[in-house]
A protein has these predicted regions:
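Active-site loops of AMP-binding adenylate-forming
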Residues: 1-12, 28-32, 59-62, 142
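Conserved A3 ("GATE") glycine/threonine-rich loop of ANL adenylate-forming enzymes
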Residues: 1-6, 17-23, 105, 131-132
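Short Gly/Pro-enriched turn/cap motifs at secondary-structure boundaries
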Residues: 12-18, 70
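Residue-level signal for inorganic ion chemistry
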Residues: 24, 85, 114, 136
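Conserved ATP-binding/catalytic segment of the ANL
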Residues: 33-40, 44-99
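Adenylate-forming
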Residues: 52, 86-115, 145-173, 193-195, ...
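C-terminal boundary motif of the adenylate-forming
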Residues: 78, 117-144, 187
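Conserved C-terminal "lid"/linker of ANL adenylate-forming enzymes
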Residues: 97, 122-124, 180, 184-239
Length: 239
């Protein structure tokens, strides 16, 4: 345990304050714009102390990547020091992707913003370093998408959604474009930069659950599994 959250500091979005035995510091992650000079201070959370691991068992290369010579453990979490002295985890270094233009985007941040689109229930943003913008794979909100198609079905190539095969609906280019446009409208309203706007979207006809392997037991995205499953569709549509 490196941080604890006493009751008087408890609030959504914070992981608390360091325990007495632990030193903590934020280190600049220059490329993504996380600096200790930001207001509030931001950067990679680094920990040191007797309760912090010294390294990986019989894996010196991993240890060298994660632990500095003077004992700081580089967590890979991007943290923020709040005015009340608590810390919040706002990102993960591994979820920051450098695009072709050299700028980084934060996948989880984009997902949290775009989830408010009324036509989806889940989303995984994916970015290729050779692309100028990200793309997304989404699970549709079926009742809302069906309602849209009852209104605009003829225009979108689904004149009778009740008789249409749902897999075909999800693969329909015009339906995908309609969902993409709404996602980007949500993103624009939230202030996303042009390079953070989605280039394309794929619609999964299947719900993502821990049982089918697309989510962890904690409802986190299994990014590698989802990407592997949609590998051919991604190659065909992106970048």
């Amino acid at each position: 345990i490196s941080l604890v959250c006493p009751p008087w500091l408890a609030r959504p979005g914070t992981v608390g304050v360091p325990t007495p035995a632990v030193e903590i510091q934020l280190r600049d992650f220059e490329e993504a714009g996380y600096h200790v000079t930001n207001s509030p201070p931001q950067g990679e959370i680094c920990l040191r102390g007797p309760t912090i691991m010294r390294g990986y068992f019989k894996q010196p290369e991993l240890t060298k990547e994660a632990v500095t010579e003077d004992g700081w453990y580089l967590t890979g979490d991007i943290g923020q020091l709040n005015p009340d002295g608590t810390y919040s985890i706002i990102d993960r270094k591994k979820n920051l992707v450098k695009l072709q233009g050299g700028e980084y985007i934060a996948l989880e941040r984009l997902e949290s913003i775009l989830k408010s689109c009324s036509y989806i229930t889940n989303i995984m943003v994916h970015a290729d370093p050779n692309a100028n913008r990200p793309m997304a794979i989404v699970v549709p909100h079926e009742p809302n998408l069906r309602a849209l198609l009852k209104q605009r079905g003829a225009e979108l190539g689904v004149p009778d959604v009740d008789k249409a095969d749902w897999v075909d609906v999800c693969r329909n280019d015009k339906v995908r474009k309609a969902v993409l446009d709404d996602l980007n409208a949500v993103g624009k309203k939230a202030g996303l930069k042009p390079l953070e706007q989605l280039q394309t979207v794929l619609i999964s006809p299947e719900e993502w659950t821990p049982q089918n392997g697309y989510l962890t037991a904690a409802q986190k995205l299994q990014r590698k599994i989802i990407t592997k499953h949609f590998e051919q569709d991604i190659k065909a549509n992106y970048p």
